[in-house]
Amino acid sequence: MKIIHYIPSIDRTSGGTTAYMQLLANELGKLVELHIVSHVSNNPVNIGNCQVHYIPTFNQYRKMKRQWLFLLNEINPDIVHINCCWMPGCALTQKWSQELNYKIVLTPHGMLEPWIIKRHYWTRKIPALLLYQKNAIIKAITLPTIMKWRNQNEDNRCYSGTL
């Protein structure tokens, strides 16, 4: 099985999602052909048992799309796993992958919690929801959660129309 994980940053200063990816890759990479796609950073973490690929950021939209599509065609993954939300690059990589009929797993890493959604609601969340985020959540084949209360929050927001 081949899996591509997209994560906006694997920099040491990026926090929990980067640490999660590092731990996950060390074990998952023993079982599958694992590729991690991110953007260049000044201080990336070392991630074992996988191939790390760097693509341009959203600021270079055309280059980002071209390199993402190239990687998809070269690797031909069974699953594309998007590890984030609220960022245009995440929604775009998902959209481009789904246009080529790849299966998508979207892991928001707690970013659908009510307190996160309320933070910068009018300036960031509403525009993101209207432009791409709600559609990305609905179109993912799965939205994994690890805690019961988080699962309830995400299910309520995603499927009740309150997102």
Task: For the regions a language model picked out, list residue spans one by one.
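An aromatic- and histidine-rich active-site surface loop
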Residues: 79-114, 131
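Membrane-proximal helix-turn-helix segments that form the acceptor-binding/catalytic region
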Residues: 99, 122-140, 152-155
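Helix-loop-beta element that forms the nucleotide-linked donor phosphate-binding surface
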Residues: 146-163
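N-terminal subdomain of nucleotide-sugar transferases
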Residues: 1-43, 48-51
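Histidine-centered beta-alpha loop that forms part of the nucleotide-sugar donor binding/catalytic region
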Residues: 8, 108-111, 161-163
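A short, charged, and often flexible helix/loop element on the N-terminal side
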Residues: 45-71, 75, 79-86, 115-123
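Alpha-helix capping/helix-boundary segments
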Residues: 42, 112, 144-150
